[in-house]
Amino acid sequence: MELTPQQNKIFEQIKAFINSDASVFILRGYAGTGKTTMVKVIADYIAQSRFLALMAPTGRAARILRQKTGHNATTIHKAIYKKPRFDAKKVKDIAESEFKLIQDIFVPESGGSIVAIVDEASMVCSRKIEHELFAFGTDNIMEDLLTFVRPHYGGKIIFVGDPAQLPPIGEPHSNALRTEYFEEKGLKVVEAELTEVLRQQGDSTILKNAMMIRDLLKKEKRNNLVFEERKDDVETISPEDFLKKYLDHRKQSGTHDSVIICYSNGAASLYNRDIRRALYGAEVPLRKNDILLITQNNYRLDRMNGEFVPVLSVGQRLQLSAPVYTQIGGVTQSVSITLNFVQVMIPDSNGCPMLCMLLEDLLTSDKATISIDESRALYINFCIRHPKLRPGTEVFEEALLNDPYYNAIRAKYGYAVTGHKCQGGEWGKVFVDYTDRTGLNDDSLRWAYTATTRAQKTLYVTNLPHITPFSKFRIDPINKCNRIDPECRILNEVSSTPFHDLNVDNGVRAKYHCIAKNIENTPYKINTVISRPYLEVYNIQTPNGIDRYDLHYKAGAIFQLAKAVTPNQHTAIIKMILDEEREMSFKFDYSPSEESYSKLYNLIRSACDTISVQITNVVEHREDYSIVFYMRTSGTFSCIKIYVNANGFITYAKPMSLIGSEDRELGAIIEIINSHFI
């Protein structure tokens, strides 16, 4: 295999590393720079003289790695942990049954001669994650990986990954690709970086855009993000036509070499629902030819997290129930939990049809996995079905690990997936919806980079980040206004409250429901609410008595900040509960009527995304050539009125807030907007 000069240089570094006293080698490489080629060459070399452990964070990534290198590759979990064992508690009441699946760290017989290669290393978690029902080693997979390799006894580990991709969930950085992380542990580190895009991929518009995002991540000042487009390579699709384009491609290609990538589990669920409606004409249960995304490794069936499988046939459906003790309103109660299963035929890892059970409840849920109570119900139901098996025995554990229901496939519909779920995968045609990831902060850019680089041939995009400086644009200082126009928001219709019937203004009722949601799981309660003209009096029950708060509001039920009649030690927290309105549900559906408004919308939306501010409405006013962006900032409503002249030039903006220049979040948005023009 012919290597580029840069790859050859790094290969020589690897050879020197194997024979050195260094323990960790970090190989960083961006999209299109030949990381997989390097992994194969390195694996071939190491396998000649050392024990090679080739692994990846997900099952899908491990399977791809095995196919591309010709070496056996497994998930990190399968490589470093022993066969699971169960710690079960003996109980009299079956509903009290508890268990914990434990997998201890496996130490290979090869001892210090092991060399581990971890591909897709940006996904390796380095924080402790404890779970009520599972225990994997020390619950820190990075620490356990190092224990498995035993670097202090001569073992070595090579991390290969893309530093521009998303870090593990809940971590600001990918520590597997950070030299400082290992040096702080007393380990000697060698590092190298692949930066040259291979010649055959150099003309790819997809990679050009990826490199643009990569370069932005390296800059402190970020003021331009515009995707390059080219037909059949990178194409923009309007939100209205996005789903249709995806469905047309599926119909024409007859393959499953395409996917929609979006930001949240909720958005993925909506896309999957709409796609199935378009395919089958109604919200029908799982059926033949549906696509599933495996969400949890299943070693019994050899189907791995991140793999996509077609449904070959659908068989019998059945329900299993079990009593489980759970907390309801602070009281422990026994409830019956019912889980739904369906028998399906899917391809096994060799492509041959196999029958298995699928846990159907998870398919359409917005949750990433089943709840702890549902997991307990699975276990308790097994105990009910096998009353003669004694928990803690080898026979019990063997039966549980082979039970078709306890080990049922856990999956989501696989037409649309999140940015984290798509990591480690590639598709010929990828459809990316960048909604909520259009900011210039690191998180948004890494998400955009990860989603963008999943496409091998064609990238179709919608709600794309598009940020450019506007040469004639200026922004006035923030003005304090006495009122915000009622058009600032359109609320969804809300139900009555214990203190308001349906004749009361919808916004007043929405405010109550928002406060009621905020006050849950706190030591406070709403005692009474008294309605007066443009005033809601909330009497809040605290551990020390009842406190009164006055909530004045303007036309359209635009509430000002709450005022405590008698401030005390509870006031600060209660004011936060009363003022926070993020739980309010708005009808926000804006489509720009022309290009200038579209550019403005992308700019304002990006600024709001960056600091997590909610846009509540956008209104175009043709009579004075303006567009008004309304938003919820610093506990109150604010707006930015922007004027666009007849030629489409954006001239100036007037920001206004009910609290004037004290509106910190509006000020931050103005700073972000201004930064684009410096």
Descriptions of predicted regions:
Residues 543-579, 628-671:
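Intrinsically disordered, low-complexity regulatory segments enriched in Ser/Thr/Pro
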Residues 330-506, 513, 539-545, 562, ...:
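C-terminal accessory regions
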Residues 11-12, 16-221:
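ASCE P-loop NTPase helicase motor core
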Residues 490-547, 570-638, 646:
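Short Lys/Arg-enriched alpha/beta "domain-start" segment
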Residues 50, 153-155, 187-192, 256, ...:
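Short glycine-/polar-rich loops that comprise or flank the Walker A/P-loop
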Residues 3, 54, 260:
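Conserved SAM-binding loop
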Residues 1-12:
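N-terminal pre-Walker A segment at the start of P-loop NTPase domains
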Residues 10-18, 22-23, 140-155, 163-312, ...:
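Conserved helicase motor core of P-loop NTPases
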